[in-house]
Curated annotation (Swiss-Prot):
Keywords: Cell cycle, Cell division, Cell inner membrane, Cell membrane, Cell shape, Cell wall biogenesis/degradation, Glycosyltransferase, Membrane, Peptidoglycan synthesis, Transferase, Transmembrane, Transmembrane helix. This is Probable peptidoglycan glycosyltransferase FtsW. It comes from Shewanella sediminis (strain HAW-EB3). Pathway: Cell wall biogenesis; peptidoglycan biosynthesis. Peptidoglycan polymerase that is essential for cell division. It catalyses: [GlcNAc-(1->4)-Mur2Ac(oyl-L-Ala-gamma-D-Glu-L-Lys-D-Ala-D-Ala)](n)-di-trans,octa-cis-undecaprenyl diphosphate + beta-D-GlcNAc-(1->4)-Mur2Ac(oyl-L-Ala-gamma-D-Glu-L-Lys-D-Ala-D-Ala)-di-trans,octa-cis-undecaprenyl diphosphate = [GlcNAc-(1->4)-Mur2Ac(oyl-L-Ala-gamma-D-Glu-L-Lys-D-Ala-D-Ala)](n+1)-di-trans,octa-cis-undecaprenyl diphosphate + di-trans,octa-cis-undecaprenyl diphosphate + H(+). The gene is ftsW. Its EC number is 2.4.99.28. Residues 59-69, 121-131, 185-186, 230-291, 358-364 are periplasmic. GO terms for molecular function: lipid-linked peptidoglycan transporter activity; peptidoglycan glycosyltransferase activity. GO terms for biological process: cell wall organization; FtsZ-dependent cytokinesis; peptidoglycan biosynthetic process; regulation of cell shape. Residues 1-37, 91-99, 155-163, 208, 313-336, 386-410 are cytoplasmic. It is an enzyme of class 2 (transferase).
Length: 410
């Protein structure tokens, strides 16, 4: 197959865009070259996110800048960046990601050090690197880089991970370095995401149960220690357990979020009609945008949004299974990791806004306002599209090779 034919063509003539078959994969491997359902789901979430950011951010934007569309305009600019990132990522072969995963890990590690030295501080946290008018939250890049590194490591040291502790604890040492640098910002939420992804991948790779449970126990103990040693983290935990004990202090944000859900009822107050976003609910367009969705679109709206997010995560897990079956371990582990990442971050964000988990400062994938998060999530989603594209090409080549052999025998 010629190189130009191997490129991912999202609008190729072989694609049938009939709506009844949009979420149904055809059995014939040559009928389509990418996962239309996954792409449609991701684009739907991104477009929906833009609408909700515009709705949730207008009161605060008006108060801070005098322009109610300030955050919406910035969010649109971020989406332009997403389009550029998608175009670039879709053209990179998966073998390149595997080849340069250690280099990517090193570059992001250097950026994490740079954040501590020359980073920009906001609300007491130093998490951003300023590049001209753009501020990059390097911890988001760390999720991306570490996920790719872990997938590559599991392929290179697969047998070693299963047979001895040395192979198991090497990536844990790398994780510990990343975790230390990120905790210095401080950003415990990102560390938890990295830890869960690491544990999940090591389990899928067949690590010994003794090492696996020792890692989980160590992680839980470290998390408890980090919470107990920092008063502000302890306040978050105690306030989430009973926010009504101090509704105008440590429990204020959560109580306002719960009020938003209560007002939403089954069908919501209608798009744009949220009361809590009128500067009652802090971070209404970022970490707590799901509460605004609940208030404006109701229980039905949040079920639909969660269903689409779950679909994306499960599609990634399914893709991982398919890749493992055809002996593409790097692509399989990476798809697994991205699915775990999307699912866990969604659970933490939603859990924090409904009072089931302490606040961690994690965004709702594809929906919350924030350039770095959007860009990284888009890159991860496009990697899934690229993985599936290469898998389908392999299937096409296998079928064509079989036909050639059958013709020769005939």
């Amino acid at each position: 197959m010629r190189s130009e034919e191997r490129q991912l063509n999202l609008f190729g003539t072989s694609v049938n865009w009939s709506w009844p078959n949009l979420f149904k994969e055809r059995e014939a491997p040559g009928m389509q070259l990418y996962d239309r359902a996954l792409l449609f789901a991701v684009l739907s979430l991104i477009c929906f996110g833009f609408v909700m950011v515009m709705s949730a951010s207008m009161p605060e934007a008006q108060s801070l800048t005098g322009n109610p569309y300030h955050f919406a305009i910035r969010h649109f600019a971020y989406l332009v960046g997403c389009a550029v990132i998608a175009a670039v990522v879709l053209r990179i072969e998966m073998s390149r990601w595997q080849q340069f995963s250690p280099l990517l890990l090193l570059i992001v590690g250097i950026m994490l050090v740079a954040v501590l030295l020359v980073g920009t501080s906001v609300n007491g946290a130093t998490r951003w690197l300023s590049v001209g008018p753009i501020r990059i939250q390097v911890a988001e890049l760390a999720k991306f880089a570490f996920t790719i590194y872990m997938a590559g490591y599991l392929v290179r040291r697969h047998q070693e991970i299963r047979e001895n502790a040395k192979g198991f604890y090497k990536p844990i040492a790398v994780f510990a370095v990343y975790a230390f640098l990120i905790l210095m910002q401080p950003d415990l939420g990102t560390v938890v995401v990295l830890f869960v992804g690491t544990v999940g991948l090591l389990f899928l790779a067949g690590a010994r149960l003794l090492d696996f449970f020792a890692l989980i126990l160590t992680g839980v103990m470290a998390f408890v220690a980090l919470v107990l040693l920092e008063p502000y983290r302890m306040r978050r935990v105690t306030s989430f357990m009973d926010p009504w004990q101090d509704p105008f202090g440590s429990g204020y944000q959560l109580t306002q979020s719960l009020m938003a859900y209560g007002r939403g009822d089954w069908f919501g107050q209608g798009l744009g009609n949220s009361i809590q976003k009128l500067e009652y609910l802090p971070e209404a367009h970022t970490d707590f945008i799901f509460a605004v969705i609940g208030e404006e679109l109701g229980f039905i709206g949040i079920v639909v949004v969660l269903s689409v997010l779950l679909f994306v995560a499960l599609r990634a897990i399914k893709l991982g299974n398919l890749c493992i079956e055809i002996d593409k371990p790097f692509e399989g582990y990476l798809a697994y990791a991205i699915g775990i990442w999307f699912c866990f971050q969604t659970v933490v964000n939603v859990g924090a806004s409904i009072g089931m988990l302490p606040t961690k400062g994690l965004t709702l994938p594809f929906i919350s306002y924030g350039g770095s998060s959007l860009w990284v999530m888009t890159a991860a989603a496009m990697i899934l599209i690229r993985i599936d594209h290469e898998r389908r090409l392999s299937s096409i080549q296998a079928v064509q090779g079989k036909k050639v052999n059958d013709n020769r025998e005939y």
